[in-house]
Amino acid sequence: MLPSAMYPELLADLVTDLPHAVRLQRLVSMLRTHFRCGAVALLRLEEDHLRPVAVDGLVRDALGRRFAVGLHPRLAAILARRGVTCFHHDSMLPDPYDGLIDEHVGEPLPVHDCMGTSLAVDGQPWGALTLDALAIGTFDAAAQAELQRLTVIVEAAIRTTRLEGEIRALQLARGTPEADEGTAQHGDIGGEIIGQSEAIANLLHELEVVADTDLPVLLLGETGVGKELFAHRLHRQSRRRAQPLVHVNCAALPESLAESELFGHARGAFSGATGERPGRFEAADGGTLFLDEVGELPLAIQAKLLRTLQNGEIQRLGSDRPRRVNVRVIAATNRNLREHVRDGSFRADLYHRLSVYPIPIPPLRERGNDVLLLAGRFLELNRARLGLRSLRLSGGAQDALRSYRWPGNVRELEHVISRAALRAVSRGAGRNDIVTLEPELLDLDGLEVPAAHHAGAGMASAFAAPALAAGITLRDAVEQTQRACIEQALKDQGGNWAQAARQLGIDASNLHKLARRLGCK
């Protein structure tokens, strides 16, 4: 039987108003203490994978991992039946947490005993609870019976959390102040947005507030912060969620085709226009149009976009007939649009239309331990991709990730983890090994050096300040430097534009566009 003190504590949490992350974390912590095991995890079933929502005893990146059920036979077996499933030390099935027990950081010790139970809420499958131990024989028949009795309390805690979330959502929709406290602290890692830092929690709360309006939103953030993911979240939480979200990468639109792509064209509008074609605005009618890299739009297109935002009408290229559209616009940029307004490359009136509700997205370096959760996600993806038994970070590697500045943000982190995993395999790591990534495999020290210093001696001179003629403007000086950098990168890469773009740290489409503007092609 459970100690008499544990039941009241578990039941008290069910009737106490707690942020859901706190409630579920307290639950798994109490279970781990009582069963005297190495780790406890509460996992939510989402389509074909399990997402950890609360863990105790696993490495810090565990909350960022996603466990594909089809690749983890123990998890599949737990989900396949109601009741407790136990795997003893002699089980031949691989454990998803091999090498991930936090008590032994840096020690690739396999799990010996494991038990778990599937969970259901309101009659529907919800996920699983798993308990793991390094000591053989931890989960005997008495422990399994105890977990069976506890399952109903775990399911009740999950149901309470769900109901409280629904209540808070209703309060938020009605503008009730009480909704703020619980919502801002949730540390939600739902969908593809992973993070529990204060910065990301505040951002998710702000998105939730503005999502239910039809205000234009301008997402501001550095390259690689995931602006598209936040745009998708805004749309999913809006009243337009059942209608399409249409994504337009403005930087990839050829200037000659931008108007046709956005607004459509009539038959005969230009050579090759053999029929009517609706544009992206019409495709998004009733829903949301996401204008990514909006700062790259040509001035002529900016004027037509402004008219559409003002009047709710579009006019196809080659047609005199206006068409009404009902579209919410979400725009995103990594540029300082105010500076572009000042230098005349972006319309002030369009800027004010788009930035009715500007939302800055924090860079990865300002998100604290979120870097480890995100790393966990990429570790699990690479583990599955490379067919490894386990892939984890050493303590030193975790410290290195936290201290690095991440100029390329989440995208750069993904590339760093993928490269490190491949290096480990190339150095002899086998499929049955528990692979631990050390700092030298991450090679973050080399990434700290600006591209100008490791692209060759010629590149260093390309980044040197240009000699300024009398009366030259700052803009002319900047363009002169950009032109020199592009020319040197192309020379270093033998004329390969894609490799030159990687050397310069920008998208290839942006490089082509910049080169055309500067007269380099």
From Swiss-Prot:
Quote the pathway field: Nitrogen metabolism; nitrate reduction (denitrification) [regulation]
What's one GO MF term for it? ATP hydrolysis activity
What top-level branch of life does the organism fall under? Bacteria
Which ranges of the sequence are annotated as binding DNA? Answer: 497-516
Q: Has the keyword tRNA-binding been applied to this entry?
A: no
Summarize induction of expression: By anaerobic growth in the presence of NO.
The PTM 4-aspartylphosphate maps to D56
Q: Which GO terms describe its biological process?
A: denitrification pathway; phosphorelay signal transduction system; regulation of DNA-templated transcription
Q: Which residues form the Sigma-54 factor interaction domain?
A: 193-422
What keywords is this UniProt entry annotated with?
ATP-binding, DNA-binding, Nucleotide-binding, Phosphoprotein, Transcription, Transcription regulation, Two-component regulatory system
**Residues that, per the record, bind ATP:** 221-228, 293-302
What is this protein for, i.e. what is its function? Answer: Required for the nitric oxide (NO) induced expression of NO reductase. Not required for expression of 2 other pathway members, nitrate reductase (nirS) and nitrous oxide reductase (nosZ).
What miscellaneous comment appears in this entry? There are two very similar, functionally redundant regulators in this bacterium, NorR1 and NorR2.
Q: What protein name does the entry list?
A: Nitric oxide reductase transcription regulator NorR2
What organism is the protein native to?
Cupriavidus necator (strain ATCC 17699 / DSM 428 / KCTC 22496 / NCIMB 10442 / H16 / Stanier 337)
Q: What is the lineage of its organism?
A: Bacteria, Pseudomonadati, Pseudomonadota, Betaproteobacteria, Burkholderiales
